[in-house]
């Protein structure tokens, strides 16, 4: 269940994301709880085999949010906007 999942992230990374991309990990968690997950995939980069990615809608745009699962804890790595996935998921 989503309610049982604990989300963690780097406070410094969150500050950088807010400053540079105007989006935060708190917004991601809120979107997850608000059922805005469009998909969950393996990280498309072969360099990160241990990661998954939320494909999530925030403010009518699609973002990828890579994360690592450790029992019931999800460690969110970053957030980046995706034109490619916006075209696919928000036609």
Model regions: which residues?
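Ribonuclease/tRNase effector modules and their secretory precursors
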Residues: 1-91
């Amino acid at each position: 269940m989503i309610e049982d999942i604990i989300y963690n992230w780097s406070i410094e990374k969150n500050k950088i994301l807010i400053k540079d991309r105007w989006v935060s990990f708190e917004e991601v968690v809120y979107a997850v709880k608000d059922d805005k997950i469009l998909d969950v995939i393996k990280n498309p980069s072969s360099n990160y085999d241990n990661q998954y990615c939320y494909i999530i809608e925030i403010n009518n745009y699609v973002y990828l949010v890579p994360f690592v699962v450790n029992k019931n804890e999800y460690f969110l790595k970053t957030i980046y906007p995706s034109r490619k996935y916006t075209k696919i998921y928000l036609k």
